């Protein structure tokens, strides 16, 4: 870390256990310059400290620092600042393409006559391999062993590549597969709350901050660590020393009071919070939690709430440091000095939260009485669509009506070679999965207790349910076994299948053949119930159309019940050994029972499991790789290919030119997610990506997933807009990645149409509705759009990360003016679009767009340029953020 010039003289010293640390004091800044800044939200105090520490008169000036102090007056700001996170967190689906980009940049800089070593992370980078394990085997004692072996075999090339990166790049560590989910590893081990490092022989203390290449990076906000998800390309730039450009955000205060009622889980709470904040509208804003309710909210529950910030649309969901933070650091085995430093530093900086503190100033606020939270799920296709437990059958029936299957509601269908029948609404996947819940001891112990009580009453999982348990941390296995609960989960088929994301990201694996055949043959609308954070269309499993987010104990309950057509609040879940009805309340544990099991979790468990976190098992250690400074690209690889983004890169960018007579590649409605744009799950054999892999000699059984193929642009560009549930208004009545090729009127895959347009050197645009790009921080949603030849995306609104990613790939994001939509303009996709831009373009400018219809009619409109900052404009002018960085390093 290189500190700034401290022209405001705020540098102070703090001594902890005899060790003296320098730090940039907010109290000094308040006393000397900015009265009242102690009333800033805690999250903005972290940003203010960052600016004080990195003030260099260039990227950070006293004007920037003053702008945060001035925020108190207007509670909003249009001022751009340069934020420098302490570190970067990655997972392998987004991490592999990021390392591919870094490797390609090394190749490019060597070709330009530079030194490969110039491309290396300047700040600590941790990549956790968690996205690749699939649920191939389940409900078996050897499921973990089998799935791990298959994972290593499938991903050998990718893992060899990451091993090369580990050797080639400084400041780059890889947490091997089979360790846990990146956000749990971050929460339980990597996160420090307060960081320290040396600069010119002096020791400095400062807040732990980060950006991550996964949208759920926000989970660490529960530990008082400011961080959020960014696209891989933005993370790469941050690694290479480029600050994160951002506007000082609005901060929404979320006041919590009271306490959760008996039987209510952290999952019920987070689904309620998500619904409230989506309704409020917090895209691009910070959310900060405060109020007396924090006193009774364990840190694991806070982390669950912070985790789902992407689902409620916020940049982050921040909890300030308090006594609960210290308790958690102690529980997870952090060393005593680090814990003492966290408390001393937070108190010295006015960053310590106490119920008696004066409330911070917020842009706006809302309030939730924790006692009002009810048992709930969310679905069937959006995480913000909360459903009370008692209303689930009604909501599923509404979904049946929506998809035209309501008349078959009571019909049963035979399953070949089985003695049971299936119906619409049957639960075919019940998964305890995802970073949101699987390292929260209270809900996992609750799931174990439900399993115990169910077994004692003679209940069993329904035979059509594929069940799985994939914890976010090995510590979970320790405490479930120590409590004697894992054996009951095993008896219900919730055997350990792996340590990773699994079902939540679409790695649910195949359904059993007989179940899959029945669902396909009769076009059944079946359900999954998962303890995940996302249930977008086509994400969990291609055959499962209704997906419900729920707490781990409810996941177990629905595996027993087997259908989403039953009201578990009043209908029996099954029958006991004597044939008596058993209800959910009969097997639901009390808060006291759960607390007794949670009390058994100890710091010893955490210290044991994280003692050799970077070592990996024998499979990982056996992987061999090259050790050169530049990567030896293999042209025959179907996993890792040299990307085209830096080919023929000139030292100076071309001037901006108008986009003329562009065709519309696709016309979309609202809530198009990054899963729609760039799916992560299975690859259909008949899709452009599947046909490409077949042409390279890859058997269908070895296709793996789109997520695992993100190191190969040839697969990913073919997979762009290939989600099986995406709907293009240019091809009404059809689902999947198809469009109308306007010059001939033919219907074809979006990829094939894009290639035809490219052959004829014709520009392309995408037009869509509200919330375009919601969901994962998936940079391939922008990279793929770029490779298809799309020059601009025009929508009613953008989700934060995807808008940034589009700019990072040289694509112009434009927003319709309020009241103007594709519908008011009566667009059908046959129009030609011209966009007037030049080097005079400015952030937030109004950009003229000309619409030329097929009948010759011409309409002119103005759109808002969603390039929001001067830095973003530079990235766009350079054709992308990495091109900008490479030119800067090479000059």
Curated annotation (Swiss-Prot):
Metabolic or biological pathway, per its Swiss-Prot or TrEMBL entry: Carbohydrate metabolism; tricarboxylic acid cycle; isocitrate from oxaloacetate: step 2/2; Organic acid metabolism; propanoate degradation
A UniProt-annotated Pfam family: Aconitase
Residue sites binding [4Fe-4S] cluster per the record: 435, 501, 504
GO biological process, any: tricarboxylic acid cycle
Species annotation: Legionella pneumophila subsp. pneumophila (strain Philadelphia 1 / ATCC 33152 / DSM 7513)
Enzyme Commission number(s) of this protein: 4.2.1.3, 4.2.1.99
The keyword Magnesium is annotated on this UniProt entry: no
Assigned keywords, A-Z: 4Fe-4S, Iron, Iron-sulfur, Lyase, Metal-binding, RNA-binding, Tricarboxylic acid cycle
4Fe-4S keyword on record: yes
Family the UniProt entry places it in: Belongs to the aconitase/IPM isomerase family.
Cofactor binding, note field: Binds 1 [4Fe-4S] cluster per subunit.
Listed PANTHER family: ACONITASE/IRON-RESPONSIVE ELEMENT FAMILY MEMBER
Reactions accelerated catalytically: citrate = D-threo-isocitrate; (2S,3R)-3-hydroxybutane-1,2,3-tricarboxylate = 2-methyl-cis-aconitate + H2O
PROSITE patterns in alphabetical order: ACONITASE_1 (PS00450), ACONITASE_2 (PS01244)
One MF term in the entry's GO annotations: mRNA 3'-UTR binding
Gene responsible for this protein: acn
Disulphide bridges, residue numbers: none
Described function: Involved in the catabolism of short chain fatty acids (SCFA) via the tricarboxylic acid (TCA)(acetyl degradation route) and probably the 2-methylcitrate cycle I (propionate degradation route). Catalyzes the reversible isomerization of citrate to isocitrate via cis-aconitate. The apo form of AcnA functions as a RNA-binding regulatory protein. Could catalyze the hydration of 2-methyl-cis-aconitate to yield (2R,3S)-2-methylisocitrate.
Name of the molecule in the record: Aconitate hydratase A
Quaternary assembly: Monomer.
NCBIfam families: aconitase_1, PRK09277.1, PRK12881.1
């Amino acid at each position: 870390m290189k500190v700034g010039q401290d022209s405001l003289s705020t540098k102070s010293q703090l001594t902890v256990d005899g060790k003296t640390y320098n730090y940039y004091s907010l109290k000094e800044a308040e006393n000397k310059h900015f009265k009242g800044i102690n009333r800033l939200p805690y999250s903005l105090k972290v940003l203010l400290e960052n600016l004080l520490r990195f003030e260099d008169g260039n990227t950070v000036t006293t004007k920037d620092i003053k702008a945060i102090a001035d925020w108190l007056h207007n509670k909003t700001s249009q001022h751009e600042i340069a934020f420098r996170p302490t570190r970067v967190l990655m997972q392998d689906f987004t991490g592999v393409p990021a390392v591919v980009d870094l490797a390609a940049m090394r190749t490019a800089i060597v070709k330009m006559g530079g030194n490969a070593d110039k491309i290396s992370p300047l700040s600590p980078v941790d990549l956790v391999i968690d996205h690749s394990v699939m649920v191939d085997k389940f409900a078996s004692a050897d499921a973990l062993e089998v799935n791990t072996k298959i994972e290593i075999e499938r991903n050998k090339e990718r893992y060899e590549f990451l091993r090369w990166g580990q050797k080639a790049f400084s400041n780059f560590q890889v947490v091997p597969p089979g360790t846990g989910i990146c956000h749990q590893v971050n929460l339980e081990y990597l996160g420090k709350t307060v960081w320290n490092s040396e600069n010119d022989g002096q020791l400095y203390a400062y807040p732990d901050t980060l950006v991550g290449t996964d949208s759920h990076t926000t989970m660490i906000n529960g530990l008082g660590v400011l961080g959020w998800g960014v696209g891989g390309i933005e993370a790469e730039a941050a690694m290479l020393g480029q600050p994160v450009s951002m506007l000082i955000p609005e901060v929404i205060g979320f006041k919590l009071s009271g306490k959760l009622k008996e039987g209510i889980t952290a999952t019920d709470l987070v689904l309620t919070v998500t619904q409230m904040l989506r309704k409020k509208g917090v895209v691009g804003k910070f959310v900060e939690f405060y109020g007396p309710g924090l006193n009774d909210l364990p840190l694991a529950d806070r982390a669950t709430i912070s985790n789902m910030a992407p689902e409620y649309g916020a940049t982050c969901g921040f909890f300030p440091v308090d006594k609960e933070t210290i308790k958690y650091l102690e529980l997870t085995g952090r060393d005593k000095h680090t814990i003492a430093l966290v408390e001393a530093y937070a108190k010295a900086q006015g960053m310590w939260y106490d119920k008696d503190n004066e409330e911070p100033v917020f842009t706006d606020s809302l309030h939730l009485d924790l006692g009002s939270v009810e048992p709930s799920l969310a679905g069937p296709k959006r995480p913000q669509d909360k459903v009370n437990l008692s209303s689930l059958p009604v909501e599923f029936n509404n979904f049946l009506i929506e998809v035209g299957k309501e008349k078959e509601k009571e019909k049963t269908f035979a399953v070949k070679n089985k003695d049971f029948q299936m119906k619409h609404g049957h639960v075919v996947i019940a998964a305890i999965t995802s970073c949101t819940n699987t390292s929260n001891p209270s809900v996992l112990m609750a799931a174990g207790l439900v399993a115990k009580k169910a077994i004692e009453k003679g209940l069993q999982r329904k035979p059509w349910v594929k069940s799985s348990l994939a914890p976010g941390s090995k510590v979970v296995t320790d405490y479930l076994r120590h409590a004697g609960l894992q054996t009951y989960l095993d008896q219900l088929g919730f055997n350990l299948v792996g340590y990773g994301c699994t079902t939540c990201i679409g790695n649910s694996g195949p359904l059993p053949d007989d179940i899959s055949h029945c669902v396909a043959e009769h076009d059944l609308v079946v359900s999954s119930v998962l303890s995940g954070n996302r249930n977008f269309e086509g994400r969990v499993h291609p055959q499962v159309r209704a997906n419900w987010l729920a707490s781990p104990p409810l996941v177990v309950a629905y595996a027993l019940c087997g259908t989403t057509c039953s009201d578990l609040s009043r209908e029996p879940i099954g029958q006991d050994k004597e044939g008596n009805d058993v209800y959910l309340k009969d097997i639901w544990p009390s808060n006291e029972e759960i607390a007794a099991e949670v009390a058994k979790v100890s710091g010893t468990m955490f210290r044991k499991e994280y003692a050799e976190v970077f070592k990996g098992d024998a499979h990982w250690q056996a992987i061999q790789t090259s050790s050169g400074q530049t990567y030896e690209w293999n042209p025959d690889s179907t996993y890792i290919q040299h990307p085209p983004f830096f080919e023929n890169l000139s030292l100076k960018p071309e001037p901006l030119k108008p986009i003329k007579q562009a065709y519309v590649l696709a016309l979309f409605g609202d809530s198009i997610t990054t899963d729609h744009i760039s799916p992560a799950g299975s690859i259909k054999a008949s899709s452009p990506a599947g046909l490409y892999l077949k042409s390279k000699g890859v058997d269908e059984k070895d296709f793996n997933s789109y997520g695992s193929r993100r190191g190969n642009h040839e697969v990913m560009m073919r997979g762009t807009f290939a989600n099986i549930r995406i709907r293009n208004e240019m091809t009404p009545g059809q689902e999947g990645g198809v469009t109308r090729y306007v010059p001939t009127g033919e219907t074809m895959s979006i990829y094939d149409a894009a290639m035809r347009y490219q052959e004829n050197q014709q520009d392309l645009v995408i037009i869509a509705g509200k919330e375009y790009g919601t969901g994962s921080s998936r940079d391939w949603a922008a990279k793929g759009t770029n490779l298809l030849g799309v020059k601009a995306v025009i929508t009613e609104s953008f989700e934060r990360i995807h808008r940034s990613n589009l700019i990072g790939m040289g694509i112009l994001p434009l927003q319709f003016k309020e009241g103007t939509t594709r519908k008011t303009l009566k667009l059908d996709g046959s129009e030609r679009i011209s966009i007037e831009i030049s080097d005079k373009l400015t952030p937030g400018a109004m950009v003229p767009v000309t619409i030329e219809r097929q009948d010759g009619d011409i309409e002119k409109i103005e759109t808002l340029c969603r390039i929001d900052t001067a830095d973003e404009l530079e990235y766009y002018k350079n054709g992308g953020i990495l091109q900008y960085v490479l030119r800067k390093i090479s000059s």
